[in-house]
Amino acid sequence: MRSDMIKKGDQQAPARSLLHATGALDKPTDMNKPFVAICNSYIDIVPGHVHLRELADIAKEAIREAGAIPFEFDTIGVDDGIAMGHIGMRYSLPSREIIADAAETVINAHWFDGVFYIPNCDKITPGMLLASVRTNVPAIFCSGGPMKAGLSSEGKALTLSSMFEAVGAFKDGSISKDEFLDMEQNACPTCGSCSGMFTANSMNCLMEVLGLALPYNGTALAVSDQRREMIREAAFKLVDNIKNDLKPKDIVTREAIDDAFALDMAMGGSTNTVLHTLAIANEAGIDYDLTRINEIAKKTPYLSKIAPSSSYSMHDVHEAGGVPAIINELFKKEGTLHPDRITATGKTLRENNEDKEILNSDVIRHLDNPYDKQGGLSILYGNIAPKGAVIKVGGVDPSIKVFKGKAICFDSHDEAVEAIDNHDVREGHVVVIRYEGPKGGPGMPEMLAPTSSIVGRGLGKDVALITDGRFSGATRGIAVGHISPEAAAGGPIGLINDGDEITIDLTNRTLDVNVSTEELDARKQNVKPFKAKVKTGYLARYTALVTSANTGGIMQVPENLI
């Protein structure tokens, strides 16, 4: 066993003394059992994580029953909704790397035989996934699950995105103070990840099709008995995987990445999933080109439209058959998925999901009646984004295929929000927010406040927004993000001037400023070199090492320093 490194032989007697001091070993023969890390992410201020200590206790008990010894440790976590719109959002994406590095450190320092990961919210799941692939120790994931959907006192369905859009509506006088406060009190009624198809739930659904989590991981409610039974089942599966030496890199293959994007397309997932999945592919040593995503989109139908793109919540999806029903429906279209891949259950993707039927065809549609014949995400290319940009087409009004507008440019998120609040942004504008990418932000903050304000003011079909930053999964409207290269890396988004005509063509997947190449080259001569905004601490180190979004916003040490 891997853990023999710290517990076998006379030279490890001091280590064994310390292990006995933990109280985790009831008898001497426990030293002969697999040591299993529980990588938890319990934190009081994140509603998606407040219940994870209870789930970890269930996992510990089950791991012992399965014949192994559990040891729990925690990582950090950032709540994107609480961190939104201020310096906290600069730390959100960078926290993914801290989580990955911290888990790698504990796992490798203590030679665990397997790892049970308990994530839930936005950056925690991908951070742990990066660690699992990097350490390549037998692993399984069981997230904390989504919260129940909110209901206003009048019975209107609510999610966190409803609350963000309500801010714009309240400022605009469209809703009353009483309505505003009622929404605030009722939008998030229980523990769990936010109830729509936002980043957390998108990633937790993708874990099912990647094969590192059990069926229904993405949709079973945080407060449900099913979630607790899933924890127990996953613990037993993990101990089996340790015995069988089934590792993350056996599961996370190029075909698994393809299938993750296919499910993403079928569910209209968050644009952040593109960023995280590309980072995971890189960690697994898979050279994954962005153009591959569009090819997957073209053959994958959009089957389930979930909040913020509709009023349906994750619980509605669960009641309609969950991710297994969507996967099984996609099996019926040959070439969409790779059903014979091995997963952490010890079975293939097909064996996990076959015969799981759709129980409500309003929530999950059949192949012959999709929301769209193509997937809910698109990669756009053009002279603004030569290395790609991402749009959640499933969140755009279906009547919009091409949008042309005049640029109104801002070099920060805050400047854009102020302009929108002051009614400087009007119908026919394309809001350009730049120097907010991974390096420029730093940290590639989410542009949820400006997009929500635009939609909340009733301009969702009349104003577009493009940025080298990113979006919350709660974003909807004509919102193009992840523009690469970013402005701070010399990307052409930094060359756009107020009044330039911009064309967003969703049919042909293009993003262009209607300015000649010669004019853009001339403008380039006047651009001043980017200077890092943060000079000390973690964000300074992050700025120095991070790449643009087209490679997943990963931290890379320059080759000349290796």
From Swiss-Prot:
Its cofactor is [2Fe-2S] cluster; Mg(2+). Signal peptide: none annotated. Gene3D superfamilies: IlvD/EDD C-terminal domain-like. Keywords: 2Fe-2S, Amino-acid biosynthesis, Branched-chain amino acid biosynthesis, Iron, Iron-sulfur, Lyase, Magnesium, Metal-binding. InterPro entries: Dihydro-acid_dehy_C, DihydroxyA_deHydtase, DiOHA_6PGluconate_deHydtase_CS, ILV_EDD_C, ILV_EDD_N, IlvD/EDD_N. It holds the Pfam family ILV_EDD_C. Binds 1 [2Fe-2S] cluster per subunit. This cluster acts as a Lewis acid cofactor. Transmembrane segments: none annotated. Its EC number is 4.2.1.9. One of its GO terms (cellular component) is cytosol. The keyword Lyase applies. The modification N6-carboxylysine is found at residue 123. GO terms for molecular function: 2 iron, 2 sulfur cluster binding; dihydroxy-acid dehydratase activity; magnesium ion binding. Pathway: Amino-acid biosynthesis; L-isoleucine biosynthesis; L-isoleucine from 2-oxobutanoate: step 3/4; Amino-acid biosynthesis; L-valine biosynthesis; L-valine from pyruvate: step 3/4. The active site is at residue 472. The keyword Secreted does not apply. It catalyses: (2R)-2,3-dihydroxy-3-methylbutanoate = 3-methyl-2-oxobutanoate + H2O; (2R,3R)-2,3-dihydroxy-3-methylpentanoate = (S)-3-methyl-2-oxopentanoate + H2O. Functions in the biosynthesis of branched-chain amino acids. Catalyzes the dehydration of (2R,3R)-2,3-dihydroxy-3-methylpentanoate (2,3-dihydroxy-3-methylvalerate) into 2-oxo-3-methylpentanoate (2-oxo-3-methylvalerate) and of (2R)-2,3-dihydroxy-3-methylbutanoate (2,3-dihydroxyisovalerate) into 2-oxo-3-methylbutanoate (2-oxoisovalerate), the penultimate precursor to L-isoleucine and L-valine, respectively. NCBIfam families: ilvD, PRK00911.1. Belongs to the IlvD/Edd family. This is Dihydroxy-acid dehydratase 1. It comes from Staphylococcus saprophyticus subsp. saprophyticus (strain ATCC 15305 / DSM 20229 / NCIMB 8711 / NCTC 7292 / S-41). The lineage of its organism: Bacteria, Bacillati, Bacillota, Bacilli, Bacillales. The gene is ilvD1.
